[in-house]
């Protein structure tokens, strides 16, 4: 089943990420400072945690870790100046 407003939720979350970066948020400063190594390491950690939760059959933990993973994927999009709308267009092209 489709979640109504999912693109809106993603866009709002992305705007919050942009705001946090401009507001000098400590977590965002840590993830976005210098090279992308810290951000990629965090993304790798979230992927690993999601995989482990899935392997252990922990549905609630999979949901939590997947939310963290999506969040950090949005941070990575911001790092590369890619908007969620661009990503959604790319995903839309996968339906063809």
What are the language-model segments listed below?
Residues 1-66, 70-96:
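Flexible "arm" and connector segments at domain edges
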């Amino acid at each position: 089943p489709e979640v109504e407003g999912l693109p809106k939720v993603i866009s709002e979350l992305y705007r919050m990420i942009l705001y946090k970066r401009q507001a000098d948020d400590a977590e965002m400063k840590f993830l976005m400072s210098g090279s992308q190594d810290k951000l990629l390491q965090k993304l790798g950690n979230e992927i690993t945690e999601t995989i482990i939760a899935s392997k252990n059959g922990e549905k609630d933990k999979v949901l939590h870790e997947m939310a963290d993973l999506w969040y950090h994927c949005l941070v990575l999009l911001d790092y590369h100046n890619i908007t969620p709308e661009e990503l959604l267009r790319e995903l839309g092209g996968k339906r063809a």
